[in-house]
Curated annotation (Swiss-Prot):
PROSITE patterns: G_ENGB. Belongs to the TRAFAC class TrmE-Era-EngA-EngB-Septin-like GTPase superfamily. EngB GTPase family. The gene is engB. Pfam families: MMR_HSR1. This is Probable GTP-binding protein EngB. It comes from Nitrobacter winogradskyi (strain ATCC 25391 / DSM 10237 / CIP 104748 / NCIMB 11846 / Nb-255). GTP binds at residues 45-52, 72-76, 92-95, 159-162, 193-195. Necessary for normal cell division and for the maintenance of normal septation.
Amino acid sequence: MTTGLDAELIEQGRKLFAGEWQFIWASPSIETLPPMSGLEVAFAGRSNVGKSSLINALTGRSALARTSRTPGRTQELIFFEGPKGVDVRLVDMPGYGFASAPKARIASWTSLIHQFLLGRATLARVYVLIDARHGIKDIDKTVLGALDRSAVSYQVVLTKADEVKVTEMAERIDITRTQLASHPAAFPDVLVTSSRTGNGIPELRAAMARLIGDHRR
């Protein structure tokens, strides 16, 4: 389901997440962001698309990022840092598309995300998580367009793949790739994951290892 990820990259990805990752910062506003350091990789997506679960699966820590059945619980930019020597941070962004949240809160989240994307020189890529069962929705298209306009590199990750029939997944990947073809800031490869089964997690780690290696050359 992914391309160009050989055994060496898979091993680099494993090593990237072999050490202990930890929570370091929560930012409710742009003024409270941590100082820029190393590289940052952010995770965006609709409420309850599985961002926190994916971060937990990547790091091998079941409770590093707090998960909730309540949509819209993550209202801050949550930063996690790798072990000494890795010099990489993961950023769990507020979920979008939660219509029941107060309008003022939605506006605050939107402003925070927009300012973060525009002003973060250490941001290497945003992984936009899309529920594999539902595909790219209108609210996702709005976010992808904003990333294009901000010239922020991003890559789509289909989540909850275990809830889609194997016979249907190839078509869903093709549809997603076709939809992304018109987005200039989108990385062409579509990643497929399941936090519950672990499928696709080694490939996502490998993709991140390649990204980090490219930025450090």
